[in-house]
Amino acid sequence: MSKIFILSAGTSPDSYNNQLAKYLSNYFENKGIENFLFDNLYSDIPFLLDSYDDVPEKISEMRKFLEISDKIIIFSPVYNGGFLAHLKNTLDWLSLAYDGNSYSALFKEKKVAVVTNVKGTGGNAQKAFEILSLQLSNYKLLVFEKFHLITKF
């Protein structure tokens, strides 16, 4: 059975994206589908620098669950037609080579779906999805092409 890795890039513990991610995680759990939810990506993950040798504990924990997951769902808010820096930073950390694994080994050929939630009409959400999809493809992820937008007024 599938194991699903869920990332929520919400900007606060109670953001709409985090609420949706938690709802989906609970739904999967009730259906007996193993899943691993990580949110608050802006906390405990320093910006990746060439001079930074220590891997954050949160990234080590994510790696452990990403290794055994075969699908990924990313919840991403949209700001100014793009996705947030803390999501890109987390993905960059996870893409690094480690312990004999090559660059993007954790991502290679895994299927990923993106769910976007915005306050308003979502006028620039499609472009943000396209930008994020391109970035995810760079990590060797297989991005579902369907665009999912949830608006909250």
Residues covered by each model-derived region:
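Helix-loop-strand module that forms the ligand-binding subsite of alpha/beta enzymes
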Residues: E57-Y139
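A generic structural motif
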Residues: N30-F36, K140-L142
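N-terminal beta1-alpha1 ligand-phosphate binding loop
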Residues: S2-I33
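N-terminal beta-loop-helix "entrance" segment that forms/cooperates
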Residues: D39-E57
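A charged, well-structured terminal subsegment
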Residues: S133-F153
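Residue-level recognition of beta-strand->loop/alpha-helix junctions
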Residues: S8, D39, F147-L149
